[in-house]
Amino acid sequence: MRITFAQGLKKFKGPPGQTRIIDVREKDEFQEGHLPQAELYPLTSLVQSVQDGAFEKDQVLLVYCRSGARSGQACDYLRSQGYQQAYNIGGVLDYKDEFGPLEK
């Protein structure tokens, strides 16, 4: 399911640890700039991260990438693994237009 950054950040504010912001870009992209409080889990290693127990199934996962394509793939995979609260919030291009510069 795709929602906007604003919807995701507003709707899913909950207890610490309940909502996580997941960046599925590669490390070099993340280092160039990322969302506040984002955690890096590249799409290329997402299967291993899930197998290693990186996420809890009751957590809200707000997933993004550069444009929304990789985050869409990541959400499809996460949902297929039982993470029903995985949401594609698009890409950093959308974020910068709406909220301004990224963190480094």
What do the predicted segments below correspond to?
Residues 64:
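Short, surface-exposed ligand- or partner-binding patches at beta-edge/loop junctions that are enriched
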Residues 1-20, 27-60, 70-104:
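Rhodanese-like catalytic fold shared by cysteine-dependent sulfurtransferases
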